[in-house]
Structure formats: structure tokens, C-alpha cells
Amino acid sequence: MQTQDQALEVAKVLTEALPYIQRFTGKTIVVKFGGNAMTDTELQNSFARDIVLMKLVGMNPIVVHGGGPQIGDLLKKLNIESSFVDGMRVTDSATMDVVEMVLGGTVNKQIVSLINRNGGQAIGVTGKDGNLIHAKKLTVNRKSPEVQASEIIDIGHVGEVKTINRSVIDVLVNSDFIPVIAPIGVGDDGASYNINADLVAGKVAEVLQAEKLMLLTNVAGLQDKSGQVLTGLTTGRVDELIADGTIYGGMLPKISCALDAVKCGVKSAHIIDGRVPHAVLLEIFTDSGVGTLITNEYSA
């Protein structure tokens, strides 16, 4: 049984959340689910409960998920070798079959099942369903120091988003379902393409003109050169941090995706620590949050 102090603490939390619930009711929140949160049972369950609660208080959560480690595990079991170019998995036809099995099958349905078990109504789709994600082949240009020129590297069925068919998402949301999207696109020729989940989440947020884009990561947020988390940034400041080398390496594509989304009309982007239970709720419903908030200069 709760003590009075414990009950008061619960009331305090709910009171702090109230203005945020009022502010974001009816708004679309795109959440990219990835990293440790996808492989830890406690984090999986807390994420699912967060999404269900968002829906229950009137928000429209859209989930986009990754699955790189799970793809790697199955490729290893099948003795299919993997290689990477600039952080992207080279995806031949055999690898693409595995990507579709893992992203469109195992991982997508696990997330849908988790949300549904926690009281939500989720439906899983890939970008091939209803031509949700129209993709084009991604080309990689790499400079060759030997000849002082660029060479085009073929990395197979790796794509980028050409267009998003928002009507598919609208049908699900208007029917009170929570869409769970696997980042597999379809090309003009019907071929499947493996697309970075952060990029898909960003493009979905842009097309829907979402209130928020939230990217779960394995770090506490964007850090400065001394290791301190930068809790609030404008798009202009992010550009400066990219230019001076503060943002680099694996964080650069994620930040660029968030930056592009905000510049294209998404109200705010959040780089949040997916290792923290209930990170999504903490970022939306508390004053302190658990990551880095990026907003446009004119709306900061």
C-alpha cells in the first residue's frame, strides 16, 4: 500500500505532465525505436507502455524501427558474410531476403505484439505495403586518392526515400491504430530496398508535419567536446557544431536527419537516451527531459 509521501509524489508527476498532455493532444509524434531499447526486455516493455499511454492521452504516435543487430545475427547463423561501406551494410539479393525477413517479419511483429499486449492497437507495415515508401537506389561516391577522382560504389539493395505515401498512415491513424513501420522501400521496378530507419523516421515526420521526431539512441544525447550533454539547440547552432567538428562520425547522420526534419517543418527533434526506461515519456512529459532537443531558430 502506498504511503502518503508516495501518493503525493505520484500526484506531483501527474501534475507536471498535465500541461504537456494538454499541449500535445491530437499531435503526431514520430518515434524511431532502435539501439539497446530493442534488445533489452525491460526497455522493450517500457517503450511499449510509453507508446500506449501516448495514444490513450490523445496523441498519435507513429513508430519506425531499425533492426541492424538482429539482421547481423541471422546472417551469421546462415553463414552469409556482411560488409559495410561508410557504415551502410552492403546488401546483395541474399542479404536483402534476410533484411525483409527480420525487419518486415520478426522485429516488426515483435513490436506490434508488445504494444498490443500492453493495451494498444498496433498494425505493422513495411514500406512496400500500399507503396508507403517509394525508394530509389542509394549511390555512394568515394574519393580515390590514387587517381584524385571519385568512384561510385555499388552497395546493392540500399536505398533512400523518394516519397512517402501518407494516405497509408492516415488510414491507420484515422482508424485509431498505431502504425509500426519497417524501413523497407520499393523501387520503380518493384525491387526492395533497405533504408536507414532514422532517415525513414525523419521523412515520415516531414510528410506528416509532425509535432515531434524522437530518435532513440545508445547515448545520453548530443555532447559537446568536453562530454557535456547539450540539452537544447537551435538548427543554426547544430550547423555550427557540425562545421567545427563537434558532431562527427556515427552521430552525424542521425543529427543531419533530425536537422533536416526541423528545417522542413517538424516542430522539434529529440535525440534521447533509449537506455533509460520510459525515456519517451520522460522527454515529452517532464521539464528536464532525457536528451537533446533541436528546434528551429524562429520557434525556439
Swiss-Prot record:
SUPFAM superfamilies: Carbamate kinase-like
InterPro entries xref list: AceGlu_kinase-like_sf, AcgluKinase_fam, ArgB, Asp/Glu/Uridylate_kinase, Glu/AcGlu_kinase, NAGK-C
Enzyme Commission designation: 2.7.2.8
Transmembrane segments: none
Pathway: Amino-acid biosynthesis; L-arginine biosynthesis; N(2)-acetyl-L-ornithine from L-glutamate: step 2/4
Function: Catalyzes the ATP-dependent phosphorylation of N-acetyl-L-glutamate.
Protein name: Acetylglutamate kinase
Organism: Saccharophagus degradans (strain 2-40 / ATCC 43961 / DSM 17024)
Lineage per the UniProt record: Bacteria, Pseudomonadati, Pseudomonadota, Gammaproteobacteria, Cellvibrionales
Gene name tied to this protein: argB
